[in-house]
């Protein structure tokens, strides 16, 4: 059974902007190299609508994979994995190995984790916050980028208290810090 990992880049002030990750572009090459290695262990990606629409370019726009050898590896890894999109508004999905679920359901996620050929990542702060509320997330992995956005969508939602234990940290030459935390215990009131 795979672990459910909330994995995302974030600015130092805890925001991801408005869902447009262009602010993380100066750090992309080194981050991509690190993530591609770790994502080889991922069997399934869970997305909300907006994050799915952002990530679908790795299959629908060949120019993304042609930017660098690391981008080509990531595109191949992403396309080979299963994807589940949780959305009540998306009409259909348009990438291979992808299915649509209308809402995040604890039982559905438990089945995905049990059947996945590796770990499962969840992306998108709204979907991840709901998964944290439902006590589904096993690992929180944040890529802290040395930039302040001053507002936007918070990477971690208010109203969810969880105890976390630092399992690893890695510093990149470009100032990014990758911090991996294991979720300890259950949801706190």
Protein language model regions, located:
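Enzymes that bind and transform nitrogen-containing heteroaromatic metabolites
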Residues: 1-189
